[in-house]
Regions:
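Beta-strand-rich solenoid/repeat architectures in extracellular/passenger domains
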Residues: 53-59, 73-84, 100-111, 123-155, ...
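Acidic Gly/Asp/Thr-rich repetitive segments characteristic of extracellular carbohydrate-active
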Residues: 2-29
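Extracellular beta-strand-rich solenoid/capping regions of secreted or surface-exposed proteins
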Residues: 20, 35-49, 55-97, 107-118, ...
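Mature, well-folded catalytic/scaffold domains that follow N-terminal targeting or propeptide regions
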Residues: 251, 276, 301, 326, ...
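Short beta->alpha connector loops
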Residues: 13-14, 32-35, 54
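Sequence/structural signature of small/polar-enriched beta-strand/turn repeats
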Residues: 64, 116-119, 124, 252, ...
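Structural signal for repeat-unit boundaries in curved repeat scaffolds
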Residues: 69, 92, 97, 116-119, ...
Length: 414
């Protein structure tokens, strides 16, 4: 950014007056906590930064709108949980580069390319959404028989024209807490099918805790802790744990493309039909170095339903619940390795599969028709502990299947 004029403010009237007067690009330095703040718009080229412990507490559902080439840093921003604490102006074609650094919000962060907004770059480093509610945010991308809830953090290109491009570099994003998950999705990055594109160099997350608030048994709606839809990301890295708490709440979900996706902390779901990692997209290498564990009827561990993944590596996969399949693959893939076993603890039950409720046994390792792999290697055993549930089902094909540590079906009649 260009050199900015400095201006320090410590009251609502000083802040609103300065923004209304405009003038040359200015870095507004905020001191203290300002309450009952009306809606604010940051002029092009301006920055808003906080001195230690600075905060903006907005009135009602008001928030901060960014225009072009803005930077917001070292601030806490509070609004209604279902409102946008930070949003982008959709009345201009290009937002330039928007920078969000070291921020905490109550309320959503929603950078949405719609209206006139067609291009720009978003850079985020250290953003924590403490509380937000995206359950009613619209529109929602749809496919595979379901629609996807937006997230506490949302980057979404809604343009119909594929020439529209939003680029991004997103690091140190986090949302919610174990005792206070955000509602709706967690981290949501999306383009539009056949239309506006999102291309991100990095999507790095810390701890994410989300609860979609979807009624159990719903067949046409899902959410995710980290969800990439019709967008391309060179590197996804989940440095912190990702935990979902509700029905149909996928922990990690991909409908787009990623060169490399790495998860280095536990992936956990605690609701029915909530999958640990599900892919309908394309990944070069998927590496999960911490446990995947699900607790809920139909909460499968890992699925490939469309697209392909070349290299797949998991630490371990454990499920607890009827119909909670451990690994289920129905498309071509390269090599799958699980280093410390696949274990299921459940029988036959109902689960959501591509927009329909189906009955499935909690098989530990299932290669469906359409699965065609180079190799499957599992150390630490494959076990299904449910009554009448087989440990392994191979209806597809794999050139090399190697399981060490035993294959065990614990229930009678398995």
């Amino acid at each position: 950014m260009a050199t900015l004029t400095d201006a320090r403010v410590s009251s609502v009237s000083e802040l609103t007056g300065l923004l209304e007067r405009g003038g040359p690009p200015t870095e507004v330095q905020l001191a203290g906590t300002l309450e009952a703040v009306p809606a604010l718009t940051l002029p092009p080229g301006w920055a808003l930064t906080g001195l230690p412990e600075a905060a903006l507490v907005f009135a009602g559902g008001a928030g901060l709108t960014l225009t072009a080439d803005n930077r917001v840093a070292r601030l806490r921003l509070e609004t209604a949980p279902d409102a946008a604490a930070i949003a982008a102006d959709t009345g201009r074609a290009d937002c330039g580069t928007l920078e969000l650094d070291d921020l905490t919000t109550v309320g959503r962060v929603a950078i949405v390319a719609e209206g006139a907004l067609r291009s720009g770059h978003l850079r985020v480093n250290a953003l924590h959404v403490e509380a937000a509610d995206a359950r009613e945010s619209a529109p929602r991308p749809a496919g595979y028989g379901v629609e996807v809830l937006q997230g506490a953090f949302t980057l979404y290109n809604l343009q119909d024209d594929p020439a529209s491009l939003i680029t991004a570099d997103l690091t140190r994003l986090s949302a919610g807490a174990p005792d206070a998950p955000v509602r709706g999705g967690g981290i949501f990055v999306s383009g539009t099918d056949g239309g506006g594109r999102v291309e991100a160099a990095r999507l790095h997350t810390g701890a994410v805790h989300s609860d979609g608030g979807i009624a159990p048994g719903t067949a046409d709606r899902i959410s995710g802790g980290v969800f990439v839809v019709r967008a391309s990301v060179r590197e996804v890295f989940n440095a912190g744990p990702v935990t979902t708490y509700g029905a149909n709440d996928m922990v990690l979900d991909l409908w787009g493309a990623a060169d490399v996706w790495t998860a280095a902390a536990p992936l956990t779901s605690r609701g029915p039909s909530a999958i640990g990692f599900v892919s309908f997209g394309t990944i070069g290498r998927l590496r999960v170095t911490a446990p995947v564990e699900t607790f809920g009827t139909g909460a499968r561990g890992f699925n490939i339903y469309d697209g392909t993944i070349d290299i797949i590596e998991f630490d371990r996969i454990t499920t607890h619940g009827d119909a909670a399949v451990g690994v289920q693959i129905g498309r071509p893939f390269g090599a799958l390795t699980v280093f410390n076993g696949v274990h299921t603890h459940g029988g036959t039950g109902e689960t959501l599969v591509k927009g329909a409720i189906e009955r499935l046994p909690a098989i530990a390792l299932s290669l469906l028709p359409g699965a065609d792999g180079g190799s499957v290697r599992v150390n630490g055993g494959v076990a299904a502990h449910g009554e009448g549930v087989p440990a392994v089902q191979v209806s597809g094909s794999v050139k090399d299947l190697d399981i060490t540590g035993g294959v065990r079906a614990g229930g009678a009649g398995s």
